[in-house]
Amino acid sequence: SSDLPPEADGKRFGDFEMDTIVGGNNQGAILTIVERSTNMLFMKKLKFGKDAEELAKAAIQLLSPYKGNIKTVTTDNGCEFYAHKAIAKGLDSTVYFADPYSSWQKGAIENANGLIRQYIPKSSPIKKINDTDIDAIMNKINNRPRKKLDFSTPFEMFSSYLL
């Protein structure tokens, strides 16, 4: 079970959700991470697809600038997350697993992945997408005003916690 502490309900800052987006015919993958309360999205292309060690390194690289602010990371039980201990240690935080078939336990990342799919359809080969494209998509999504945030952007909200 997820055993996520009740205070990680999406209202406090510092609870993250993590997932992967896979290209058509399993061609390549992108690591996606979202901070729950602000919807701030982090993305990184994984050269070797769903490789657990590469994924752990990518997660640590993306989030290490915010190390002191990371309370929890929730992911699913996919085999690519088997290096979760390395992620927990590298980010000085706790990794939780959502229960199988309970995507609502990580609604923020499911929502973000839906937004990403507007730019990267399921059929598209992720191998052909470069890091510049990924950064551009990430910036577009993070600078899109959200109703949930009273029409502030994820970037504005996330930044306000780091001041």
List PLM regions with ranges.
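Acidic/histidine-rich, metal-coordinating catalytic segments
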Residues: 68-83, 101
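Charged alpha-helix within mobile-element recombinases
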Residues: 64, 88-95, 99-163
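Active-site beta-loop-alpha junctions of metal-dependent nucleic acid enzymes
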Residues: 25-26, 43-66
